[in-house]
């Protein structure tokens, strides 16, 4: 399948083209037998000759081209309606009745606060043009009215409040919120792209519109993305600030769902965290962890969870023995990832010592059994022993459940 994407360098176009090229190159294998042979990327710097050629070859068109922030309102109609006319005329010239998708906007409803929107009028004119084209040629026409869009690569200080908030907060710049109570319906870019792939496979979601409300209908003239989120401007801002606080610290869900550990993949919080991270400046993408260092090596906590314990990294210097303690109830798993070591355990009240020789050459997990005193010994004379340590509970200094006793008496 050969696919033409207009507006390919815009926010939606860039994300869509990347995923289409992933499919083309065999990198995205989750779409069954969908095959993409070519992705024709048309944008403002493309030539009329390229558009003409690609309209003759393509098997599907995503028309994302349009004007969002012109210098004067006349450019809305020229950019949104005018190019749509050129595109459809070129397809007609080649008798190409392949499916065509139009990126429209909620503002095309011309209802409520959008009643006098010049942008909305230009989008509505484009919709009518496409729908008439479908009747005239028999081509399948998919008209999507998108709500507010957000996600990685969205340009800040342009036409997305979320992009501006994420960019400013990530860069310690002030933001302006005039009314926290404003209701918003927002659509995440990856959810949009997934719907575009559905459309490519003939599995688009149809609807009618009653004002801004989507009325799902298999016979509907319009299409919609089934995954959106309705929230307030204030809730969006608060969540982005929560993301900012959680980023430069050990992931810790013990005090609430403010980290990625407690963000279900279908949640708005997950989408806003991913979006926020895409705006982090270079210097904020790296930060120090608290290393507990002594002459024996170091111990650094990596992850705290509310109900699933913690993960840490332990480094032992050559010849060093660590541990020599046992627990009543909590258990641990030691996973040596570099170096050569010996893990020993002995059941309290007995003399038998269990020995487990481990190394980074063969990754294994050794369970520290409750009621067994245990240690870990670096057998190397020259190399550090690096061990990932999982414990089923986060360490509580007031109830450590840890009792010193050497394994070998």
Residue spans for each PLM region:
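N-terminal Rossmann NAD(P)H-binding glycine-rich loop of SDR-like oxidoreductase domains
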Residues: 1-26
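NAD(P)H-binding glycine-rich loop region in Rossmannoid oxidoreductase-like domains
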Residues: 43-86, 90-94, 107-114
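Conserved Rossmann-fold NAD(P)-dependent oxidoreductase catalytic core, especially the SDR/UDP-sugar
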Residues: 85-127, 134-137, 142-144
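Conserved beta-loop-beta element that borders a ligand/cofactor-binding pocket
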Residues: 128-153, 173-182, 217
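A conserved pocket-lining segment of Rossmann-fold NAD(P)-dependent short-chain dehydrogenase/reductase
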Residues: 147, 164-187, 207, 215-225
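Substrate-positioning beta->alpha
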Residues: 156-164, 181-202, 206-207, 234-235
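Mid/C-terminal beta-alpha module of Rossmann-like enzyme folds, strongest
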Residues: 198, 202-290
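A short glycine-rich, His/Asp/Glu-containing loop-to-beta-strand
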Residues: 284-324
């Amino acid at each position: 399948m050969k696919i033409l994407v207009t507006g390919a360098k815009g926010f939606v176009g860039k994300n869509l083209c990347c995923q289409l090229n992933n499919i083309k190159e065999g990198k995205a294998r989750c779409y069954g037998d969908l095959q993409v042979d070519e992705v024709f990327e048309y944008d403002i710097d493309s030539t009329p000759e390229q558009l003409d050629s690609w309209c003759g070859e393509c098997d599907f068109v995503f028309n994302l081209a349009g004007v969002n922030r012109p210098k004067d309102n006349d450019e809305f109609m020229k950019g949104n309606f005018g190019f749509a006319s050129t595109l459809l005329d070129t397809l007609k010239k080649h008798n190409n009745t392949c499916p065509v998708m139009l990126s429209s906007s909620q503002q095309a409803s011309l209802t409520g606060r959008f009643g006098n929107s010049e942008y909305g009028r230009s989008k509505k004119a484009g919709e009518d043009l496409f729908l008439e084209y479908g009747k005239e040629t028999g081509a399948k026409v998919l008209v999507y009215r998108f709500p507010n869009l957000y996600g990685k690569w969205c340009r800040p200080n342009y036409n997305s409040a979320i992009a501006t908030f994420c960019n400013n907060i990530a860069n310690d710049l002030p933001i302006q919120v005039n009314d926290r109570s404003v209701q918003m319906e927002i659509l995440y870019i990856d959810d949009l792209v997934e719907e575009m792939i559905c459309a490519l496979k003939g599995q688009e979601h149809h609807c009618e519109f009653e004002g801004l409300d989507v009325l799902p209908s298999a016979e509907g003239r319009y299409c919609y993305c089934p995954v959106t989120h309705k929230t307030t401007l204030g809730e969006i801002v608060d969540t982005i600030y929560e993301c900012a606080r959680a980023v430069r610290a050990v992931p810790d869900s013990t005090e609430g769902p403010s980290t990625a550990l407690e963000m279900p993949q279908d949640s708005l919080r997950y989408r806003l965290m991913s979006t926020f991270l895409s705006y982090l400046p270079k210097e904020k993408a790296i930060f120090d962890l608290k290393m507990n260092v002594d002459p024996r090596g170091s111990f650094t906590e990596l992850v705290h969870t509310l109900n699933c314990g913690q993960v840490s990294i332990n480094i032992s210097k050559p010849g060093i023995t660590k541990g020599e303690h046992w627990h009543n109830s909590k258990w641990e798993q030691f996973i040596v990832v570099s170096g050569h070591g010996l893990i020993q355990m002995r059941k309290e009240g007995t003399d038998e010592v269990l020995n487990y020789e481990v190394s980074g050459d063969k990754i294994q997990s050794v369970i520290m059994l409750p009621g067994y005193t245990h240690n870990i010994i670096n057998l190397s004379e020259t190399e550090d022993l690096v061990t990932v340590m999982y414990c089923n509970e986060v360490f509580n200094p007031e109830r450590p459940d840890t009792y010193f006793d050497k394994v070998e008496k």
